[in-house]
UniProtKB/Swiss-Prot annotation:
Part of the lpfABCC'DE fimbrial operon. LP fimbriae may participate in the interaction with eukaryotic cells by assisting in microcolony formation. One of its GO terms (biological process) is cell adhesion involved in single-species biofilm formation. This is Probable major fimbrial subunit LpfA. PANTHER family: FIMBRIAL SUBUNIT ELFA-RELATED, FIMBRIN-LIKE PROTEIN FIMI-RELATED. Belongs to the fimbrial protein family.
Amino acid sequence: MEFFMKKVVFALTALALTSGTVFAAESGDGTVKFTGEIVDSPCVLSVDSQNQEVVLGQVQKSVFAAVGDKSPAKPFEIKLEDCDTTTMKKANVSFSGVGDADKSDLISVSTEAGAAKGVGIGIYDNSNTLVALNGGKASVDLSKGQTVLYFTANYVSTLATVTTGYGNAQVDFNLSYE
C-alpha cells in the first residue's frame, strides 16, 4: 500500500506542477521590425533626423500682402553623430522635391483639393539664406563627435493673391561630404 501511495503522491505532484501551463491563456503576439543601414561615411545620421515633421501651423492669409512675404519661421535640424574628421571636413545637405510652379527654388505645396494657392515653402540655413530646392546646398564644418545643421522653414507667397487651404508638402534631403 505504501508503494501505491507514493505513486499517487508523485502523480498528483507532477499534475500540479504542469497544470499551470496547460491552462495558461495566450495573451497575444506581435512583430518586432528591425531597420537600419550600414554606411561608409564620416558621420552617421541621427535617428531623430531621419524622418521629421515640421509643423508650420495655421497662418493668417493677411501675412501675405505681397510676393515674397513670409510666415513665421519654424526651426528644424539635421543631426550627425559619430563624426570622424580625419578624412572629410565638411557636410553638405541638399533638398529635392517638387518645386513651386511660380518660384521653382521653393517647395510646392500639395495640389490636392483644398490646398492653398500662391504659396511655397522655403528652407533657410543657419544664416537665413534660402537653400534652393533641387540644386542648392547648405554646408557646415564637421565637428568630431556630433555636428548639427540648423534650418528654418516657412511659407513664402509666390503670387500677389494667396488663397486659403492646406499647405502640406514633402521634401527629401541628401547628405554629402567633402
